[in-house]
Amino acid sequence: QQWAVGHFM
């Protein structure tokens, strides 16, 4: 889940 990197960060 690379989207999580920009979503939580």
Curated annotation (Swiss-Prot):
The record's annotation in InterPro entries points to: Bombesin (IPR000874)
What residue ranges are annotated as transmembrane? none
| Residues of the signal peptide | none
Q: Which domain of life is it from?
A: Eukaryota
Main location class: secreted
State where the protein is found: Secreted
Tissue occurrence: Expressed by the skin glands.
Q: What keywords tag this UniProt record?
A: Amidation, Amphibian defense peptide, Pyrrolidone carboxylic acid, Secreted
Instruction: Indicate where the modification Pyrrolidone carboxylic acid is found in the sequence.
Output: 1
Listed GO biological process terms: defense response; neuropeptide signaling pathway
Q: Which residues carry this modification: Methionine amide?
A: 9
A GO cellular component entry from the record: extracellular region
Family (UniProt): Belongs to the bombesin/neuromedin-B/ranatensin family.
- This protein's name: Litorin
